Design a protein with these regions (language model features):
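A cross-kingdom marker for long, charged
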Residues: 206-295
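Terminal, regulation- and interaction-focused segments at domain boundaries
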Residues: 21-62, 120, 142-215
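Beta-strand/loop substructures that line and gate deep hydrophobic ligand-binding cavities in soluble
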Residues: 95-115, 250-268
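Hydrophobic alpha-helical segments and helix pairs
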Residues: 106-149
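Short, cysteine-centered beta-strand-loop-beta hairpins and adjacent loop/turn segments enriched
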Residues: 76-81, 115-118, 225-231
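Sec-dependent N-terminal signal peptides
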Residues: 4-16
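Mid-chain, structured segments of secreted extracytoplasmic proteins
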Residues: 65-108
């Protein structure tokens, strides 16, 4: 009986610790004097050799000093598709690179931060599997560097699951619907064709299509100089470059995005209201751009 009691106490203590654990949106992995190209090659190799699938890469804001590598894992895709409220958005993880003078900084989105925010309800049942994927990704990046320094702020699991920037600001569940098509196939074809044509000054970074589930996700480069990445990243901070690219998701016959006021704040949780006001038009600009992909 004493043994059972002790095991119960240990379990409850461990569970409480997990519940209260702070997560940062990013981990700084390495600093070196390598080029962007060398860094990208090493990242792709390290992830591929650890069982991850490379989805795509690009230069945010069309900058020669910035790059992002997007990747996923088969188990993550499987789990994400079980979350009906846009869970597939969490399928793509990202590594960011920034060349600052002679120094190349490599950082990654913290997988658990994103999982807690995007999976919302029901994450507890998959937490061990998700933690395993997160640990595997971080371990893979140790082939690049061993710094593993959290940055970008901290939030507890419980707050991430119900995250919003301020009162009256949107939550994850307040996704913005862009268009309802007659069918999934029509929506898929329309968005694919528009991305191929670069409509709205966009470019496809990656694409995930699950035809049997009628779900598709795209990472989209926002290339308009006046209201795209080149406009807002320098203002809110390109140290968080791994936040990009922005996503559009097609579920069933409905295309939607996460509201800019939610997604930007989630990836820049330390952003002051003063700085946020400087990009006041950005959430609307992003929505307008993404809508063009559905027309």
């Amino acid at each position: 009986m004493r043994r059972i009691f002790l095991l119960t106490v240990i379990y409850l203590f461990t569970f409480s610790a997990i519940q209260a654990q702070d997560e940062s949106p990013y981990l700084l992995i390495n600093k070196s004097d390598e080029s962007l190209a060398e860094g990208i090659t090493k990242i792709k190799s390290a992830l591929s050799e650890s069982g991850f699938k490379i989805l795509g890469e690009y230069s945010p804001a069309q900058s020669e000093k910035l790059a992002v590598v997007c990747y996923t894992h088969p188990k993550l895709e499987e789990i994400a598709l079980n979350f009906s409220d846009r869970g597939a958005l969490a399928s793509a993880l990202k590594v960011g690179l920034k060349k600052e003078g002679e120094t190349l900084k490599i950082s990654m989105t913290n997988p658990m931060y994103m999982f807690y925010a995007y999976f919302v309800d029901g994450v507890d049942e998959q937490e061990m599997a998700l933690r395993s994927i997160s640990d595997q990704a971080i371990k893979a990046m140790k082939n690049i560097g061993t710094m593993e320094v959290p940055f970008g702020g901290t939030l507890e699991k419980k707050k991430l699951q119900k995250y919003h920037y301020k009162v009256m600001m949107p939550y994850f569940t307040d996704a913005e619907e862009l268009k309802t098509f007659d069918s999934f196939d029509e929506g898929l074809k329309t968005i694919q064709q528009n991305l191929k044509a670069g409509k709205g000054e966009t470019e496809k970074v990656y694409e995930l299509v699950y035809t049997d589930k009628e779900v598709a996700v795209w990472g989209v480069a926002l290339k308009n100089v006046e209201d795209g990445e080149a406009h807002f990243l320098p203002i809110i901070g390109d140290e968080h470059v791994a936040a990009m690219p922005y996503e559009i998701i097609l579920q069933g016959n409905t295309a939607s995005i996460l509201p800019g006021k939610y997604r930007i704040a989630l990836h820049w949780p330390e952003l002051t209201m003063g700085t946020f006001m400087k990009i006041m038009s950005t959430p609307g600009d992003i929505k307008t751009t993404m809508e063009k992909l559905t027309e």
